[in-house]
Amino acid sequence: MVVRREKKSRKMRGSRTMGWGIRGQHRDRGSQGGRQIGMHKEKWSWLVKYGKGWYGKHGFRNPTTKLTSAISLRKLNELLESGYIKIKEMDGKKIVDLNELGYNKLLGGGSISIPVTIKVGKATNKAIQKVKEMGGEVILSPTE
């Protein structure tokens, strides 16, 4: 391809269309924007098909809400049996510290098959009862 030494715009002055052929070819829609620009104009058809809920108000996240990271006895039992959670031995007791693992509440769903001492911030009455029936205990130690 031949290198253009002078600008096309400079060479074609006075030629009515300046290299764009028929007059209407250069009268197109201009810049349609980049990423996520013009959703209410140029990209409306895409928005109608894929962008449900693009416009409007959609609530907010309450900054004072405290999120709880809970684990059920069923899930805890699975993690203990698979070896994913290591049991610590201290004074002949098997101890699992859920606060260290990022959980702050123990739920009573399911059952546990290993008698362990569980340290956690909060626990339901049902969970405490089931752990005691198995021969373990629940120590409530708030993290906050």
Swiss-Prot record:
SUPFAM superfamilies, per database record: Ribosomal proteins L15p and L18e (SSF52080)
**Top-level taxonomic group:** Archaea
- One Pfam family, short name: Ribosomal_L27A
Keywords, ordered alphabetically: Ribonucleoprotein, Ribosomal protein, RNA-binding, rRNA-binding
For the region Disordered, what residue ranges are annotated?
1-35
| Ranges of compositional bias, category Basic residues | 1-14
According to the UniProt entry, its GO molecular function terms are: rRNA binding; structural constituent of ribosome
The UniProt function text for this chain reads: Binds to the 23S rRNA.
Family stated for the protein in its record = Belongs to the universal ribosomal protein uL15 family.
Entry protein name: Large ribosomal subunit protein uL15
Q: Which source organism does the UniProt entry give?
A: Saccharolobus solfataricus (strain ATCC 35092 / DSM 1617 / JCM 11322 / P2) (Sulfolobus solfataricus)
What lineage, starting at the top, does this entry show? Archaea, Thermoproteota, Thermoprotei, Sulfolobales, Sulfolobaceae
